[in-house]
Amino acid sequence: MVVRSLLRVSRLTSASCRHASLAVSSTPKPYIPSVTGVQKSMPFDNLLEQYSRVHWDDSVTYDDPNVQKLFKSLMSGSRAALASAITLVESRHPTKRAQGNMLLKMVLDEEREKYKKFGRDSMIFRVGISGSPGVGKSSFIEALGAELTENRGKKVAVLTIDPTSAMTGGSVLGDLTRMQELSRNPKAYIRQSPTSGSLGGVTRGIHEAVILCEGAGYDIVIIETVGVGQSETSVSDMCDMMCLLLSPAHGDELQGVKRGIMEMSDLLVVTKDDGDLKAKAKMTQAEYISALKFMRPRLDVWRPKVMRSSIMDKESVSEVCSSLYEFWDTIGESGDLERRRQDQMKKWMWNHVKDEIMSVFQKHPKIAHLAPKLENEIRSGKITPGLAAETMIRTFFGV
């Protein structure tokens, strides 16, 4: 009897163990798609903390001597310090990037105090200028800069964005040769930056450069883009005003400009209003005035203007300049300026998140090890790009 009971207990225990084993084996495991030639193990999990120390530097503090020295020189209006500061915030080096972020925080704190004392008078006017190649952007900016510095007593900063070649990685950066007079003006500062393929054509540090120009005491910053496209959308997210330049020499100019570019523009200027093109410029102006009637203005307090200008006629440049500041006063009094600045800061936070995540993702040991193999699988047609992307993302998160 005792033996029979022991045998029954033994059988029950054995069955329980089998059920427990099945329960354990049925526990869901992390899903990793089956990809030929890719090792499914994750040997780099322990490197995440070390990798974060390579990518970010937390040792930079408010008392960093390099940051303090650069901050004092920048606040005194040094153009050399401004150039060094912009280079610092554009750097990808962890320590330099940390120093750049600390410098930006100090500048923003200082500008906040100035705003409490002087209000809108302490703020820099941000103007984006766009237009198709050959419209005369550089010549117009030089004429506008001369009007602002010589006749209106303003300090002008010009930030130009040149496209980076997708084939060679180089860029022309030729605006300094086209703005020779303005580059020699002591009240002007010109900085050229390649897009480096980031943010739809807007270089990574351009927004920070605007903040640094404000800290250096400049009254107006002009951001010039090359061509019309995605970069104009990004530039409009960091400017107070968008100015679109149009050329009467390009035939049917109205067909060559995207509706979205016109809708985000606050001022349209037909250039080269002189000589044989004067009649054509007047006709182009009339066409755009008519076209704008069918578009809703970006702001309720401002209806976009269409003007004509020629760098040969200083009075026409002065009229454009007056329209710029008419817009500035209008949005300042209505409260749209402060609201727009706040929205821009939020958008640029998410732009930086996207840019930073992509950089971290591509350089992470897991992905650096996995990506070349997945690329080979895509080339051989054994896996779709979508599945390869999912594999990398799930490998990165370990799920």
Curated annotation (Swiss-Prot):
It comes from the Eukaryota. Disulfide bonds: none annotated. Residues 1-15 form a transit peptide. CDD domains: MMAA-like (cd03114). It is an enzyme of class 3 (hydrolase). Its main location: mitochondrion. GTP binds at residues 131-139, 274, 310-312. Disruption phenotype: Reduced incorporation of 1-[14C]-propionate. Defective in adenosylcobalamin synthesis. incorporation into macromolecules. Its EC number is 3.6.-.-. It is found in: Mitochondrion. InterPro entries: GTPase_ArgK (IPR005129), P-loop_NTPase (IPR027417). GO terms for molecular function: ATP binding; GTP binding; GTPase activity. The keyword ATP-binding applies. Keywords: ATP-binding, Chaperone, GTP-binding, Hydrolase, Mitochondrion, Nucleotide-binding, Transit peptide. GO terms for cellular component: cytoplasm; mitochondrion. May have GTPase activity. May also bind and hydrolyze ATP. May function as chaperone. Likely to have a role in propionyl-CoA and adenosylcobalamin metabolism. Belongs to the SIMIBI class G3E GTPase family. ArgK/MeaB subfamily. PANTHER family: METHYLMALONIC ACIDURIA TYPE A PROTEIN, MITOCHONDRIAL, METHYLMALONYL-COA MUTASE. NCBIfam families: lao, PRK09435.1. This is Methylmalonic aciduria type A homolog, mitochondrial. It comes from Caenorhabditis elegans.
